[in-house]
Amino acid sequence: MAATCQVTGAVPGFGHNISHSHRRTKRRFDPNVQKKTYYVPSLRRNVKLTLSAKGIKVIDARGIESVVKDILARGVKI
């Protein structure tokens, strides 16, 4: 899925638009997903990740090495 965070696993949510007359139409709530490139010294290369805003904060807090290690342990190809 394109709108999925590789760190947090955030995926789109679904709900309704509700008009003034309370008619409901289906809609999708997408996470704030960005493509971001990081240099990973242990791999000696750049890694391009699809991240939500929260995922970027997780990398800032824990470090890219720790996060990439967890992603690879889950078997996700990066």
Curated annotation (Swiss-Prot):
Lyase found in the keyword field: no
Keywords of this entry: Ribonucleoprotein, Ribosomal protein
Any GO BP annotation: translation
InterPro entries noted in UniProt: Ribosomal_bL28, Ribosomal_bL28/bL31-like_sf, Ribosomal_bL28_bact-type, Ribosomal_bL28_sf
Pfam families linked: Ribosomal_L28 (PF00830)
SUPFAM superfamilies: L28p-like (SSF143800)
Single GO molecular function: structural constituent of ribosome
GO cellular component assignments: ribonucleoprotein complex; ribosome
Family of the protein in this entry: Belongs to the bacterial ribosomal protein bL28 family.
PANTHER family recorded: 39S RIBOSOMAL PROTEIN L28, MITOCHONDRIAL, LARGE RIBOSOMAL SUBUNIT PROTEIN BL28M
Protein name as it appears in the record: Large ribosomal subunit protein bL28
